[in-house]
UniProtKB/Swiss-Prot annotation:
A Pfam family of this chain: LIAS_N
Organism: Vibrio campbellii (strain ATCC BAA-1116)
EC number of the protein: 2.8.1.8
Family statement drawn from the similarity comment of this UniProt entry: Belongs to the radical SAM superfamily. Lipoyl synthase family.
SUPFAM superfamilies: Radical SAM enzymes (SSF102114)
Major place of residence: cytoplasm
Protein name (record): Lipoyl synthase
Residue ranges occupied by any Radical SAM core domain in the UniProt entry: 80-297
Amino acid sequence: MSKPIQMEKGVKYRDADKMALIPVKNMPSEQKEVLRKPDWMKIKLPADSQRIQDIKSAMRKNNLHSVCEEASCPNLAECFNHGTATFMILGAICTRRCPFCDVAHGRPLPVEAEEPKKLAKTIADMKLKYVVITSVDRDDLRDGGAEHFANCNREIRELNPHIKIETLVPDFRGRMDVALDLMKDNPPDVFNHNLETAPRLYRKARPGANYKWSLQLLQKFKEQHPNVPTKSGLMMGLGETKEEIVEVLKDLRAHGVTMLTLGQYLAPSRHHLPVERYVPPSEFDELKEIALELGFTHAACGPFVRSSYHADMQAQGIEIK
């Protein structure tokens, strides 16, 4: 029997190194014929600009991270050019190793106590009116990082009293009640937690996560804060059926969720889960209509939609595709 890999604290494991650490072995993209992108998935990326460099410089200066960079989001250039970014707190190393995600896995460094203040000042310097805060999973922390989320919300509002905050949280596995209690006095304006895919695909795509647990997290937060909208997102193209997605939408509505994002999964590398199919825009349109019929007040559905893509516009109900 081979010895388990001894991970060094603070070292990022990515691509093949990360996939090698996943107990549930999946067929990686490198062993399959890679699907060619259809025309609707081909876009011209905006050129590099001073605005993009300014945002990156502000991040580096304060030792902050964006999920845009860490997860290799295809919308990075567009969002940075518009002066928006999704900040990723609690470091850039995740304790989970989901094979669809490009965020590094490993043993995280200790939480930086000054991060909330640095984050608040950076947001003030950028003159943002709407901000999305997300994080890596921190299963190494007793509260899963919940108190740090609360501290960030508090510090951001102290320096930016008119800002709107959306938090995209992990599942706080095994510590949900503790986490919700720690965050109750500093809730966001929108509470987001992504289900990512249909429950049948959890073992393959979200090892370590639990579909029902995630639904309960969304429901319990809503019960605690009935006036704060809850939101969730799903990827298409991992092997799910349209019928399975509709059932997930029904589950979300049954648990009080009113905001939805649906987007096309793109494999970050040949080592990640392969794209099983490219979902045509017309199918996203159909699912949006179904979502609205089910009672979602906001539904951003389209190939390039991501959970925090134009989140400020999503919150206003402006159509996003």
